[in-house]
UniProtKB/Swiss-Prot annotation:
InterPro entries: DEAD/DEAH_box_helicase_dom, DEAD_box_RNA_helicase, Helicase_ATP-bd, Helicase_C-like, P-loop_NTPase, RNA-helicase_DEAD-box_CS, RNA_helicase_DEAD_Q_motif. This is ATP-dependent RNA helicase DRS1. It comes from Cryptococcus neoformans var. neoformans serotype D (strain JEC21 / ATCC MYA-565). Residues 671-688, 726-740, 761-771 have a biased composition (Basic and acidic residues). Residues 427-606 form the Helicase C-terminal domain. It is found in: Nucleus, Nucleolus. Its EC number is 3.6.4.13. ATP-binding RNA helicase involved in ribosome assembly.
Length: 793
C-alpha cells in the first residue's frame, strides 16, 4: 500500500551542482613576518595605574561640601589655576606675541625679549637652586658634618682613659655583662618564637614569575600589568605564602609588598571549592586607613580582571553605605578588604556574618596596627578568626618584638626582612633646611613652593587644623592645593587624591593619614613641614616618592627641637643621599612680609567658612527633625547598633592613641621653656661615661641597702605581733549579746573575766580581798510592777 501523506505540498525540483568543479581563488604563500610577536597582554600593555577616578564611585553621598577655593577666589578676585594651566597660558601668550612681532627689527625683538624676561615669573629662572646659595653662615653649611662628628665624639668618650680603681672597673664590666645577657635572652626568645627562613640560604631564588609555578591566568595578568620580574620581597615571600606559612615581611617603601601577598592569595583561590557549599569569606586584608584599603582593592581587582579569575571582593571601610556593604556580605565574597572599625561593626550588627571559614589573614602596615588605638580592635578581630588560619604581616618598618607579636597567635612565623639596614629607597635624595625660629617656618615653605617646587608635591603637617589653614594661605598666594585629613568626608578625601593624581592640583596638604601605603605615580617631592616624632613615621613619609626604582627627593624643615630626629634620619641614610638646602634669607623675609599682609584675609576666610558650616548644620538639624516626625515609627523600629566596648572604653582607647601620637613630638614653645627651667642641670651632666656609671651603681647599692633594712624591720614587726600576750595582761574574749541595748545591736561585746582581775590598773573592775567595797543590793529590783500577770484572772 502506498504511503499517503496528508496536508503536504510537493516541492519544486532543486538544482544541485554537487560534483561540478568550482573555480577557487589562488592563494599566494606569504612569507613569515620576522618582526611578529605574540601579544601576551591581550592588547593591554599598560601598567597598573591607581587613583584613576573610579574610586569615588559608591561613596555615600551627602550635602555638597563647602569649597574653600570659591571663598578664596571671591577674596582674590581671580581664579586659582594649576601650574600646568599657568604654563600653557604663558606659552600661548608667548606664541601670539611672536606672531605679531615677526616683521619687527632685531633691536626691537631683543628689547622685547629682555622685557619679557624681566616681567615673567621668576620661577623659570630659579628652578634649579644651588645648594650653596644664600646668606647662610658657616654653622648652617656644616650642619650635617657637625652631627656626624657628634657620633664620633660619643665613641671617643667611651674609649677615653681615666684614673679609676679596680672596684669601679668591675662595676662597669658587670653592667656590660648584664646588658649582654639581656640581649642574649631576647635573641633566645626570638629563636624559639620564629622559624628559620629557608630562602636566605637558597641560591636558586626565582628570577621570574614563571619559575614560581603560578597558574597561567595569573601569569597573564602579571604580564599585562607589566610585572616583568619579581622584586626581592616578592621573590622570597610568594613561595613561602604558597606553602601556607606565617610571614613577617619587611622591605623598603615602593618595593611591591601589596603584590607580594595578593598574588599568592589569588593563586590559592584558583583551587578553592566551587561546589554548592563552597562559597565563603576566605581572605581578610586589614588596613589602617580607608585610602590604603581602597588601593589594595584596586590592585586585587586589576589582577583578577586581567587574568579572568572568578574572584569577588568586598570593601568594608567607613564612609561607604552600611546597607550596601551588608548586602554584599550576604553573597559571601572571597576576599574582604577592611578597616578594623567597620569590620567589627559588621561582625557585631550584620546577621549571619562570621569569619569562621577564614583561611588567610593579612595585616598591612602591621607595625601601625599594633600601636595604641588599634590594639583593642585588633584583639577582637583575632578572637573572631579561626586558629588554623595563615597570617601574613607586612610593613616597611616591621617590628620583630615577641611581646607585641604574641598577641596575634602566630604559628612559627618566618621573618622575611629584605635589606633590614636600609629603610629608604635608593633613588631618594634627602634634603634638610634649618629653621632658626618657628615664625620663619611658613615663609620658608612658601618660598620653596614659589621658587623651586611647583607641582607634584605632598606636604605633611602634624595637625588637621594647620593643614587646612595652610591650604587657605596657598590659595591666597595663587597656589592650587588640596587637603587630605580626617576632618573631611570620604568623598572629599578620595576626590583630593584623584585631583592630585590628574594634575588638577599641584600640592597635597596632608597629615600622617596619607603617609602609609599610598602609591601615587608622579610624586616628585615630599616636604615635611615639621619633623615627625618617630623615625618610622619619617621613613613612611619620605617613602611616598622614589617608588618602584624612580627618583625623588624629600625636603624637611628642621628646627632646634627636631635635632634628635634629624640626627637619627642622617644616621640611617647613606652619605650620598643627604643634602643641606639653604633658602635665601631675602626670599624668606619677602614671604614673611606678604604673609603678614594676608593675616586679616585668612581670619575672614576662616570666619566665613565657619558661618557657612553653622548654617548647613542648622539646615541638617531641621531636616533631621522633619524626618523624625514623618518616619518616627520606621526609625524607632530599627535595631540599635552595638559595639564590643562601652562608650568610656572606646573614648579611652581613642585618647590613648592620640596621646601616644602627640607625645612622640618634641615639646616646643612655652612648655619646653618650663621644662628647661625645672631641669637646668641634671645630676649626671658633665660626667664622663665611666664616672656616670660608677655614681649610678653607688646609688643603686644605697637603694638596695635601704630596701633590705626596710624589709628586715618589717619582718621583726611581724614576728613581734605573732608572739602570744603575757599572762599578766587581760585576755579578751567574746560574749554573746545580752539584754537591753546590747540585744538591740545584736553584736557580741568583748569582756574580760567575770569579776575582773586584781592586777587591773585602770580600776574599772571590781576589786578582791580586804579592799573590796560593800555591794549594795536592791531588794525591790526583782518585784514585778503593775500590769496583769500571766495567771491573773
Amino acid at each position: 500500500m502506498a504511503d499517503d501523506f496528508i496536508t503536504t505540498i510537493d516541492s519544486d525540483d532543486e538544482v544541485s551542482n554537487y560534483g561540478e568543479p568550482s573555480a577557487l581563488p589562488k592563494i599566494k604563500d606569504d612569507e613569515l613576518d620576522p618582526d611578529f610577536q605574540f601579544d601576551l597582554g591581550g592588547g593591554r600593555s599598560e601598567g597598573l595605574d591607581l587613583w584613576g577616578g573610579d574610586e569615588v564611585q559608591g561613596v555615600k553621598k551627602g550635602n555638597e561640601p563647602i569649597n574653600v577655593d570659591d571663598i578664596i577666589e571671591r577674596k582674590r578676585g581671580k581664579p586659582i589655576r594649576a601650574f600646568k594651566d599657568r604654563k600653557r597660558k604663558r606659552d600661548e601668550d608667548a606664541t601670539s606675541e611672536d606672531d605679531l612681532e615677526e616683521d619687527e627689527e632685531e633691536e626691537g625683538d631683543s628689547n622685547d625679549d629682555s622685557d619679557a624676561a624681566k616681567s615673567g615669573d621668576s620661577e623659570e629662572d630659579e628652578m634649579d637652586v644651588d645648594m650653596s646659595e644664600g646668606d647662610g653662615d658657616e654653622e648652617d653649611e656644616n650642619e650635617i658634618e657637625s652631627l656626624k662628628r657628634e657620633d664620633e665624639s660619643d665613641e671617643e668618650e667611651e674609649e677615653e682613659e681615666d684614673d679609676y680603681d679596680e672596684e669601679g672597673e668591675n662595676e662597669v664590666v658587670d653592667s656590660d655583662s648584664e646588658s649582654e645577657e639581656e640581649t642574649a635572652a631576647e635573641i633566645a626568645r626570638k629563636d624559639a618564637f620564629f622559624s628559620s627562613d629557608p630562602t636566605t640560604t637558597d641560591p636558586t631564588l626565582p628570577s621570574s614569575f614563571t619559575a614560581m609555578n603560578l597558574s597561567r591566568p595569573l601569569l597573564r595578568a602579571l604580564t599585562s600589568l607589566q610585572f616583568t620580574a619579581p622584586t626581592p620581597i616578592q621573590a622570597r615571600a610568594i613561595p613561602l605564602a604558597l606553602l601556607g606559612r606565617d610571614i613577617l615581611g619587611s622591605a623598603v617603601t615602593g618595593s611591591g609588598k601589596t603584590a607580594a601577598f595578593m598574588v599568592p592569595i589569588l593563586e590559592r583561590l584558583c583551587y578553592r571549592d566551587r561546589g554548592k557549599g563552597g562559597a565563603a569569606c576566605r581572605v581578610l586584608v586589614l588596613c589602617p586607613t580607608r585610602e590604603l584599603a581602597v588601593q589594595c582593592e584596586a590592585v586585587g581587582k586589576a589582577l583578577a580582571e586581567k587574568g579572568g579569575l572568578d574572584v569577588r571582593f568586598a570593601l568594608l571601610v567607613g564612609g561607604l553605605s552600611l546597607n550596601a556593604q551588608a548586602h554584599t556580605l550576604r553573597t559571601l565574597p572571597d576576599i574582604l578588604i577592611a578597616t578594623p572599625g567597620r569590620l567589627i561593626d559588621h561582625l557585631t550588627n550584620t546577621p549571619s556574618f562570621t569569619l569562621s571559614a577564614l583561611d588567610v589573614l593579612v595585616i598591612d602596615e602591621a607595625d601601625r596596627m599594633l600601636e595604641a588605638g588599634f590594639t583593642d580592635e585588633l584583639e577582637e578581630i583575632i578572637k573572631a578568626c579561626p586558629r588554623s588560619r595563615q597570617t601574613m604581616l607586612f610593613s616597611a618598618t616591621m617590628t620583630d618584638s615577641v611581646d607585641e607579636l604574641v598577641k596575634l597567635s602566630l604559628d612559627k612565623p618566618i621573618r622575611v626582612f629584605v635589606d633590614p639596614k636600609r629603610n629608604t629607597a635608593r633613588g631618594l635624595t634627602q634634603e634638610f633646611v634649618r629653621i632658626r625660629s618657628d615664625d620663619s617656618r611658613s615663609p620658608s615653605l612658601l618660598a620653596l613652593c614659589k621658587r623651586t617646587i611647583r607641582e607634584k608635591c605632598i606636604i605633611f603637617f602634624r595637625s588637621k587644623a594647620l593643614a587646612h589653614q595652610m591650604r587657605i594661605v596657598f590659595g591666597l598666594f595663587g597656589l592650587k592645593a588640596a587637603e587630605l585629613h580626617g576632618n573631611l568626608t570620604q568623598e572629599q578625601r578620595l576626590q583630593a587624591l584623584n585631583d592630585f593624581k590628574a594634575g588638577t592640583v599641584d600640592y597635597l596638604l596632608a597629615t600622617d593619614l596619607a603617609s602609609r601605603g599610598l602609591d601615587i605615580k608622579g610624586v616628585e617631592t615630599v616636604i615635611n613641614y615639621d619633623m615627625p616624632g618617630q623615625l618610622a613615621q619619617y621613613t613612611h613619609r619620605v617613602g611616598r616618592t622614589a617608588r618602584a626604582g624612580r627618583k625623588g627627593r624629600s625636603v624637611s624643615l628642621v628646627g632646634e627641637a627636631d635635632r634628635k630626629m634629624l640626627k637619627a634620619a642622617i644616621k640611617q641614610a647613606e652619605a650620598d643621599q643627604v643634602r643641606h638646602r639653604i633658602i635665601p634669607s631675602e626670599a624668606v623675609t619677602a614671604m614673611k612680609e606678604k604673609l603678614e599682609e594676608f593675616k586679616d584675609d585668612i581670619q575672614e576666610i576662616l570666619k566665613e567658612e565657619k558661618e557657612e558650616k553653622l548654617l548647613r548644620q542648622a539646615d541638617m538639624e531641621i531636616k533631621k527633625g522633619q524626618n523624625m516626625v514623618e518616619h518616627e515609627a520606621e526609625i524607632f523600629s530599627r535595631p540599635a547598633r552595638t559595639w564590643f566596648q562601652s562608650g568610656k572604653e572606646k573614648q579611652a582607647s581613642k585618647s590613648a592613641g592620640k596621646d601616644a601620637y602627640v607625645g612622640s613630638f618634641p615639646s616646643t614653645g612655652k612648655s619646653a621653656e618650663k621644662e628647661k627651667e625645672k631641669l637646668k642641670r641634671g645630676k649626671y651632666d658633665g660626667l664622663s661615661r665611666r664616672l656616670k656609671r660608677r655614681k649610678m651603681a653607688i646609688e643603686e647599692d644605697a637603694a638596695d641597702a635601704a630596701a633590705a633594712r626596710k624589709t628586715e624591720m618589717g619582718i621583726r614587726a611581724a614576728k613581734k605581733n605573732a608572739l602570744p600576750k603575757k599572762i599578766t595582761e587581760p585576755q579578751p574574749r567574746l560574749e554573746k549579746a545580752g539584754k537591753g541595748k546590747d540585744k538591740k545591736k545584736g553584736k557580741a561585746r568583748r569582756v574580760t573575766g567575770g569579776k575582773g582581775s586584781a592586777f587591773d590598773s585602770e580600776g574599772k573592775k571590781s576589786h578582791e580581798g580586804m579592799r573590796a567595797k560593800p555591794a549594795k543590793v536592791n531588794l525591790e529590783k526583782g518585784k514585778k510592777k503593775g500590769g496583769k500577770g500571766k495567771g491573773r484572772k
